[in-house]
Amino acid sequence: MNRETIGRKLAVPRVANSVCCSDNLELMKTIESNKIDLIYCDILYGTGKKFKDYHDLKPIRNEIESHYIPRIKEMHRILKDTGSIYLQIGTKISHWIRLILDDVFGYYNFLNEISWCYAGGGIPKNNYPKKHDVILFYSKTKEYYFKHQMRSYSQKGSGRRSNGDKYDLQGQTPVNDWWIDISPQNTQSKDNVDYNTQKPKALIERIIKASSNECDLVADFYLGSGTTAVVCKELNRNFIGCDINPKAIEIANARLDAVS
């Protein structure tokens, strides 16, 4: 994003299907209102740690609020009335983020708190191991788009509705809010890149398929390794991607170039 764009609202086609190295707040301010169909962001988790690729926010409430309140307000402004937002976050500050979302989007537009569960990592001495991320799901209005995603159900389970009818003759059931069937990013996978906290494509694919249609516009303002943009391109969605780290944008562009 060059200096000429700052302070001027951009028509969406000029920024769609591109990723840019920019402060996400400044980029969002240049996007016209009510233009985005879906926002997914794997936001900063507030650990206070310094990673190889970025420095996380400290878990201090004032710092968290000063960073996220203006950004979430902009996300609300640029989201369509039929749109929805998913913010992925760790358990350390998820309660603060939910309060901000309640204030900006309205608690009545809270749809779900999804738990993405995974294995691996260490075991703390004086606490339960933390083995899930929180994904907060909100809509802008009650007129949002949503399509159930299906998964194979256990042979031990009933796979039935409350009235006893089977969900699907092919042995599938709608995905619920407890996601245990998607593994973390495999470091040996061909999709793996040299970037911290890379999320698996299957995770983002589920969200994009559930809350957008082909040719819709999806935005990720904490792009990281670029997985959201890659999945959008593969699923025929338009996208906007942004990250303040030049390395992230370099990796994302390389991955996008590799998508046929």
Over which residues does each language-model region extend?
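Core catalytic lobe of class I
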Residues: 1-259
